[in-house]
């Protein structure tokens, strides 16, 4: 009995032994995993070794490789930063748009009301302009006229000598045409329709309210005076370019009472462009050394010369005369520049002029067109020195005020006949 019971107990105990195979399976799996891990580790090491070998093959020093790596990292960081910033800005803009849309949202009724109010306001403005008799163009013209300034002058007539006496007293509230916020004004005075005789005041530097106090005489018989018109044009002087006209005042002589001296202010109006034939401009410098009695004239260049040849060009050269009392003392000339209307010379000429004579001489500059066959025709002329006016007088005065220093200036060429008449030259 005891043996049978023990046998049965042994049989009952047999099912409790299955955990042994699972442990063995786990052990085998762990062993396999460890083998795979070892293989992965070996493969990683091999990749690193290959990478380092490839790096060693590159013909660059280690510090260069380090620098490249640093630059790459910095670029990556900056790209990330920019992307983050853009995302944040987009979110902010969306929020702002929503807030504005909520606050400033308009209905169709609001739009219609705004349209009606705008139309009503425009009609009111038009009615106001109609009442005052002004259009928008008129307003602009008035503003332009106001900016031109005004001129004070006097008029008198000498019946015994048949002379019209014009006094240019002063100007006020002139516009600023120079960079420094001022102008260099002077006044041209002439009588229409002939324009034969023109006068110019002295140039006043850096002022918008110049005081001239200069008088000019025109010899006109009283019987012819009624058909004349006096023109007083204010200009802004510029040494290196064309003088800008500021404005002008026109006075028909048949509207003036010459029974007494007339003195009045006139607002300057927009001046008409002078329709004078353009002969060109010339630039030259003047230098005077008083101790040596040496006057140096450098002919620099000319521009926009009149076309004298059939082909639409010229062969210009320049003559320089030193004159006194209508007599030519010395003569110089430049080289000839072929087929051009804008010649460049940069040629220097010297004259001996004692200090006591410098105020009595004149330098006459003539631009001529060279011709092989016929006579060389004069294109234009200008003179500085004694008896010169306006820009020419200013150039001469600046030279005397700055001894030993070359003073360059552009001059507009005048017709030869007019200059010769002023100089009293005999051909």
Curated annotation (Swiss-Prot):
Cofactor, how bound (note): Binds 3 Ca(2+) ions per subunit. The ions are bound to the C2 domains.
Q: Which residues bind Ca(2+) 1?
A: 178, 184, 236-238
Q: Where does Ca(2+) 2 bind?
A: 177-178, 236, 238, 244
Positions of region (Disordered):
96-145
Task: Provide the membrane-side ranges marked Vesicular in the record.
Answer: 1-57
Q: Which residues are on the Cytoplasmic side of the membrane? A: 85-427
* SMART domains the UniProt entry points to: C2
Cofactors per UniProt? Answer: Ca(2+)
Biased composition range(s): Basic and acidic residues: 109-124
Residue ranges occupied by any C2 domain in the UniProt entry: 147-266, 278-411
Q: Which UniProt keywords apply?
A: Calcium, Cytoplasmic vesicle, Glycoprotein, Membrane, Metal-binding, Repeat, Synapse, Transmembrane, Transmembrane helix
Describe the function of this protein: May have a regulatory role in the membrane interactions during trafficking of synaptic vesicles at the active zone of the synapse. It binds acidic phospholipids with a specificity that requires the presence of both an acidic head group and a diacyl backbone.
Record family assignment: Belongs to the synaptotagmin family.
Q: Which PANTHER family match?
A: SYNAPTOTAGMIN (PTHR10024), SYNAPTOTAGMIN-1 (PTHR10024:SF239)
Q: How does it assemble?
A: Homodimer or homotrimer (possible).
Its recorded name reads: Synaptotagmin-A
Species name: Diplobatis ommata
